């Protein structure tokens, strides 16, 4: 794989802006804060990165999610209409995620390695609701569509870790009046999480890398355009071209477990060589 990207040299003023942004999202390591020549990279991952780990994608060609209509199991209206059905659906997903044969693959580990080098200069955004990035070692992940192993109070919004089944009768006792707990998932018609931080990151990015995404679902499908507007070099790593592949500067196709480690390895090698030459 030959990476066709610009040299990893950056204007000091842009890194000052990066410093302000990073301090808003994550606690910064003082040693990392002193490193001003690392590129600022935004990575977006989708279902394609977890498919090789055994995570089934929800949406089938016929528009059904595990034999259910999307409207029935992935909308606020569906939850209000039949909370038992919705809870059963996500209970099954939760149990599947915790099966012993479900594990991070080489692509997840490669991104954890990238974070280990770039530190706060990497913002990892995922559309996935699994925890495979964290299990691979990534510590700073924005789950824009929520997390399967968490639930939240429908009254206060308090988020709780949750690994077992959840019934429609389960109540959160954080409020004056116990309220139902729902999956901590962004359903259709709801606002994705962390959007202010995401758009700020896209505005500051030197590189935007999209991995395993279809380009069908907005606002994530528009991130490549947004990052382009601010001068980022854009890269698509995917099994096949996405719906927005024409907007990317650079494209590599194949299994995520192969193309992602290869790309990141050469990316870090190239950046390391350029930094030594400064």
Curated annotation (Swiss-Prot):
Active site: 145 (proton acceptor)
Protein name, per record: NAD-dependent protein deacylase
Note describing how the cofactor binds: Binds 1 zinc ion per subunit.
Organism expressing this protein natively: Yersinia pestis
Residues where NAD(+) binds: 46-65, 127-130, 212-214, 238-240, 256
Protein's UniProt keywords contain Metal-binding: yes
UniProt xrefs under InterPro entries: DHS-like_NAD/FAD-binding_dom, NAD-dep_sirtuin_deacylases, Sirtuin, Sirtuin_cat_small_dom_sf, Sirtuin_class_III, Ssirtuin_cat_dom
EC number: 2.3.1.286
Domain notes: 2 residues (Tyr-90 and Arg-93) present in a large hydrophobic pocket are probably involved in substrate specificity. They are important for desuccinylation activity, but dispensable for deacetylation activity.
Entries under Gene3D superfamilies matching the protein: SIR2/SIRT2 'Small Domain, TPP-binding domain
Family to which this protein belongs: Belongs to the sirtuin family. Class III subfamily.
